[in-house]
Amino acid sequence: MSDGDYDYLIKFLALGDSGVGKTSVLYQYTDGKFNSKFITTVGIDFREKRVVYRANGPDGAVGRGQRIHLQLWDTAGQERFRSLTTAFFRDAMGFLLLFDLTNEQSFLNVRNWISQLQMHAYCENPDIVLCGNKSDLEDQRAVKEEEARELAEKYGIPYFETSAANGTNISHAIEMLLDLIMKRMERCVDKSWIPEGVVRSNGHTSADQLSEEKEKGLCGC
């Protein structure tokens, strides 16, 4: 796809404590590479990737491909950047929430991150995929898979164990998040409505319509 040759621009935000591997996960997804020497993100950064999304119909048939330009925003996890990070929550349509499988505190802080999303995202029930990262470091694991899955089930969100080092489940997690977003859009009664964080290739957004649809409860917020 050439520049501008897409149906939708969709913004995802990666968030979680500092050091959980947000930058490495996004870099693995967009470039297929792992860099163990990344420095801690300061403020906000982003990466981009073009994909084709094909929805399955009720009869299992694959629908027409939607050309998607993904913007994957990488946020600083440190407390001193928290106000800057939350300012970007409303501009994103989906959230990749990461914790470090070798760091129990980063897992315990997942609840705080979800609370922040519920307060600052485009609605109280945004689309989130939870990722326990660094699954390749099994001998250093501090969080049991059952614990993480139980927490994800409590919030009704998908859970994946990922590794930026070898790429395990990273594409699956982001594809799942994209699928949740596209299905949310399909559920909208007014098909001309596109949520914040989603831009048509003509550059038009619909922030005003978002508030109206949220009040009507049309899109599952």
From Swiss-Prot:
Detected in melanocytes. Expressed abundantly in the stomach and is predominantly localized at the apical region of gastric-surface mucus cells. Also expressed in the thymus and lung. PROSITE patterns: RAB. The modification Cysteine methyl ester is found at residue 221. A motif (Effector region) lies at residues 38-46. Its main location: membrane. It is found in: Membrane; Melanosome; Late endosome; Lysosome. GTP binds at residues 16-24, 74-78, 133-136, 163-165. Its EC number is 3.6.5.2. GO terms for biological process: antigen processing and presentation; blood coagulation; complement-dependent cytotoxicity; cytotoxic T cell degranulation; exosomal secretion; melanocyte differentiation; melanosome transport; multivesicular body organization. It is an enzyme of class 3 (hydrolase). Regulated by guanine nucleotide exchange factors (GEFs) which promote the exchange of bound GDP for free GTP, GTPase activating proteins (GAPs) which increase the GTP hydrolysis activity, and GDP dissociation inhibitors which inhibit the dissociation of the nucleotide from the GTPase. Activated by GEFs such as DENND10. Disulfide bonds join 123-188. It catalyses: GTP + H2O = GDP + phosphate + H(+). It holds the Pfam family Ras. GO terms for cellular component: apical plasma membrane; dendrite; exocytic vesicle; Golgi apparatus; late endosome; lysosome; melanosome; multivesicular body membrane. PANTHER family: LD44762P (PTHR47980). Small GTPase which cycles between active GTP-bound and inactive GDP-bound states. In its active state, binds to a variety of effector proteins to regulate homeostasis of late endocytic pathway, including endosomal positioning, maturation and secretion. Plays a role in cytotoxic granule exocytosis in lymphocytes. Required for both granule maturation and granule docking and priming at the immunologic synapse. Binds SYTL1, SYTL2, SLAC2B, MYRIP, SYTL3, SYTL4, SYTL5 and MLPH. Interacts with UNC13D. Interacts with RPH3A and RPH3A. Does not interact with the BLOC-3 complex (heterodimer of HPS1 and HPS4). Interacts (GDP-bound form preferentially) with DENND10. Belongs to the small GTPase superfamily. Rab family. This is Ras-related protein Rab-27A. It comes from Mus musculus (Mouse). The lineage of its organism: Eukaryota, Metazoa, Chordata, Craniata, Vertebrata.
